[in-house]
C-alpha cells in the first residue's frame, strides 16, 4: 500500500485484503426493493421497478444497443432525467454533493463506535454469541466508506468530489488504525471463540469470520507487549516506504548502450533516426519499448547481447532498496513468531507453506519442460547454433513472421467486426443465463447516480425476476482515465439484521439501512440483504457519435480481458454469503483469480461464440471457417512461445519464494546471487554465467515483489486449477453452455465466496470419482495436493493480461 495511512499494518482486520491492494481504481452500486408488511420504511426497500417486466428479448436487444449506439444510449439514459431530486452517486443517499462524503463518513463512524462499545461491554452469553456478526458489521461499515471513497477519489472528474472522497477515506482509515490498537476487541473475540457455549450457536460462516479476524489481529501485533508492538509498527512503516521506493525507483545500471548505427539493421529506421547521434552511433535506451523492439528485430547478435544484458541489470541503488525490503520483512516475520516472511504470509492461503509452493512450482517446471524444449528446438534450428537468452525474442519474431506470411488467414483481420462491445456484453449475459440462470438488464441511471455520462448501469436478475446485483460499466476511454482493466466490489453482499433495520428507522425517516444502495429480501429467509455492487473499468474506444456510427470493436485479446473481469464479477454476484467478510472475491489470495481465469476459456469456444459473435453491421454470425482460423492462429502462436512464457512466470514465482522463504535470522541477502541460482537451476535458457560476463540483476525490475511478496505463484496456481476444471467440468468446451456443468461449478465454487476452503471447492467441483481427487484427497490440501496441481500443468496458452 502506498498510502501513508496504511503503513502501520501489513493487513488490516477491518477491511478486505483485496480492497487494500487497490488504491488505484473504482467499484460500484445500486438498490431495489420488495415491499414487506413488516417494513418500517415509508418507501419499499426491495420493489422491482415496473420496467423489470420487459421481456428477456427486449432486455437482450437493449443490452447490445446501450453499448453499441451512442444515440440510443443518450435517449435511454435520459428517461429519468426529469426526476426532481438528484440521486447520490451509485444511489448512496449521502453523496448528492461533495459535502455528503463528510456526512457519510461521520454517520458510519458513529455506528462503528456504537458497535465497538457494545463489543467491549459484552459480558453475557447472548452478547458473546452475536460478537462475530457484530464485528463483521463493523468491518462492513468501514468498507462501505473506504471502498466507495477510494473508487470515487480516483475515477470522478470533479476535483472537489475527489478531495471530499479523499478526506472521507482518510477519516475512516485513521479510525481503523485506532481499532487495530484496541486490544479489548481482540480479547473479547478470543474469549467468545474459546467458549463452546458460544461457538455451538455460531454458524459456519460466523466461525470462519471469527478465525479470520483473530488471525488479522495477530498479524497486526495487537497481542505483543507495547515495545514490541511499536517495533512492529516501525517495521511496517519502513516496509511500506521501501516498497513504494522499490516499485517507483526501478532503474538500470546504464541508461543506454552505444551502438554503431550500421549494426542496427532490422530495427525500424524511424526509431534508429530517433536515437542516432552525430558520430554514426546510436544510444539505445535500456528501458521502455525500444530495447524490446531491438531484441526482436536487430540482426546482429552481439548488439542483441549487449542490449539484453544492459536492460536486465539494475542499479546498485535499486538492488539496495530490494535487499533492505527483504531484510525488514524477515525481521517482521521473526517478531511475529514465524520462520520466514513466506511462512507468515502463506499460513492462511491454500498453499499454507513455502514448502508446498515449492512442490507446486517444481512439479510445474517438470510438466512444462517438454513443451519448452519443443519450442526452443525449433528456434535453434533457425539459428543453426546454440540458442542464447538474447536470441529468443528475435527468433520468435522471425517464426511469427514466417507463420503470418505463409498460413495466417487474411480473414482474421476482420474478426473485430464481429466483436462489438454490445454483442460481447450480450454474449456474457446469455452465457450467464445458460450456466447460472442470471442475466444482465440495462437500467436507466437516475440523475446524479453515475460519475460520467458514459457509465452504463446493469442490474443482474435471476430467473424469477429477482434483483440480485448491480454493475456499473465504465468501459470507454477518456482523458486522464486509468487505462488498466479492473473489477471493483463497491459493496459486498450481506444479511441486514432486523435490529439494524429497526435502528435505522428510529434514527431518521429518510435513513436507509444500506445508505440507499441496492437491497433485496431473501425469498427463503425473508431477511433483508444488501446486494453486491460492482464496477467494471476498461479502456475501450468510444463508439461513433451518430446514429449509424461504428461501435467499439474489440480484438480477441480485449474480448478475453472483458471475460476475465466478468469472471471476478460473477464471483461477487453469486458468492452472496450472510457475512460480508467472506462474500464474493473475499477469499484466499491464491484462490481469487480462479473464476476470472476460468472465464477466459469460455470467450472463444464455438458454442459460446455462437451466442454473440455477429457482424456489427449485417448481424451475420462468425463463420465456422473464421472460428477455425482463430483456433489455428492461437495454437500456432502458443506452439511458438507459450511454454517459454509459462516458464518465465514460473521462474518469477520461484525467485519470489527464494527471497521470502529465507530464515528470519539469515542475515543480509545477496539478491543477485539468489536470482542467478534460480535461473541456473530451473531455466531452459539461463542467464549467462561465464566469468567474463557480469551477472544480470533483473530482480530490480520485478515490482510485484512488493505487492505480491511470497504470493506471486497465485496466478499460475489458479491457471492450473482453471485448466483442470475447464477439462473435467466443462469438457474442454463441450459443456461450455451446459446448465448442469454451470450449476456444479456455481454450487461447489462460486456461491461460497471465501466461506469454504479453496481445496474443498476444487475437490467438490471435480468429485471423488476424479482420478486427481480419488477418495477426496484434495480436500485437506497440503504438500501432495500442491504437487498434484503442479502436475496438471498450464498448457500452452501463455499468460494473458
Curated annotation (Swiss-Prot):
Entry annotation: catalytic residues: 565
InterPro entries annotated for this entry? M3A_MIP, MetalloPept_cat_dom_sf, Neurolysin/TOP_dom2, Pept_M3A_M3B, Pept_M3A_M3B_dom
Family named by the database record: Belongs to the peptidase M3 family.
Q: What class of enzyme is it?
A: hydrolase
Cofactor(s) the record lists: Zn(2+)
According to its UniProt entry, the function of this protein is described as: Cleaves proteins, imported into the mitochondrion, to their mature size. While most mitochondrial precursor proteins are processed to the mature form in one step by mitochondrial processing peptidase (MPP), the sequential cleavage by MIP of an octapeptide after initial processing by MPP is a required step for a subgroup of nuclear-encoded precursor proteins destined for the matrix or the inner membrane.
Q: Which residues form a coiled coil?
A: none
Q: Which Pfam families match?
A: Peptidase_M3
- One GO-annotated biological process of the protein: peptide metabolic process
Its name, as the record gives it, is Mitochondrial intermediate peptidase
**Transit peptide location on this chain:** 1-41
Q: How is the cofactor bound?
A: Binds 1 zinc ion.
Where does the protein end up?
Mitochondrion matrix
The protein's matches in PROSITE patterns, at most eight in alphabetical order, are given as:
ZINC_PROTEASE
Superkingdom of this entry's organism?
Eukaryota
Catalysed reaction(s) here are: Release of an N-terminal octapeptide as second stage of processing of some proteins imported into the mitochondrion
Under which EC number(s) is this enzyme classified?
3.4.24.59
Per UniProt, the keywords (alphabetical) are: Hydrolase, Metal-binding, Metalloprotease, Mitochondrion, Protease, Transit peptide, Zinc
A molecular function (GO) held by this record is: metalloendopeptidase activity
Question: Which sites bind Zn(2+)?
Answer: 564, 568, 571
GO CC terms for this protein?
A: mitochondrial matrix; mitochondrion
